[in-house]
Amino acid sequence: NEIVFSKVSNQIIHEKYGGVVPELASREHEKLLPTMLRDCLYQLKISLIEVDCIAVTQGPGLAGSLIAGVSFAKGLSLGSGIPIIGINHLEAHIYVNILSDRDLDFPFVCLLVSGGHTQLWLVKELGKYTLLGQTRDDAAGEAFDKGARILGLGYPGGPEIEKIAKKGNSDLINFPRALMVKGNLEFSFSGLKTSLLYYCKENKKTNINDIAA
């Protein structure tokens, strides 16, 4: 199996807010899903009746966006007779690695970083997992978004910070790293975010590229 076509909508509507606004996200889902489906079918040169199954995220995630996606998928299923499968969005992130790495065998350890989640899982076999550790506060993505806002950068924060960090000196500033203790598999990003905030207030002349690095 393989991914034959993928289409992603941009998140520019959230940029001025510095993060995802749930109400706006759900409205954008409702508006863009029909167009994105048409684009996918057009690019693949197939019709909807040639689709064998519809998979849709049923959670976890923002309630409004989930409802928009599930409602759209159910409508397609009822109208076409194509069966529908509800997908756990975190499980999907785990299993997509098998598509990209054919040599990946069970068991394996997966670092799952998605939206509000930063977790470390032991994947024993299909459907069997053990949570080894997770963030105690902010997820990595949230920390990037908040960090970018502190630095006056755009949204989403991760790519914006990465872009300027490549131009900076990563050895110049030593920000603290939390929970760096042997045997501890959990994460914490709130302390790093706070350190960044105070550093920027006290060192306004420091090159922003070096701070990001």
Go through the PLM ranges and name each one.
Residues N1-P60, H89, H93, A212:
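N-terminal beta-alpha supersecondary unit
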Residues V4-S6, D105, L112-V113, L120-N209:
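A short helix-loop
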Residues G18-L24, V56-A63, T130-T135, V181-L185:
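A short glycine/serine-rich beta->alpha loop
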Residues A55-T57, N88, V109-S114, W121:
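Short beta-strand segments
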Residues V56-G81:
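Short Gly/Thr/Asp-enriched flexible loops that form oxyanion-binding sites at enzyme active sites
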Residues K74, L78, V96-S100, R149, ...:
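Short, well-ordered alpha-helices that flank and scaffold nucleotide-derived cofactor binding pockets
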Residues G86-V109:
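Conserved phosphate-binding catalytic cores of ATP/NTP-utilizing and phosphoryl-transfer enzymes
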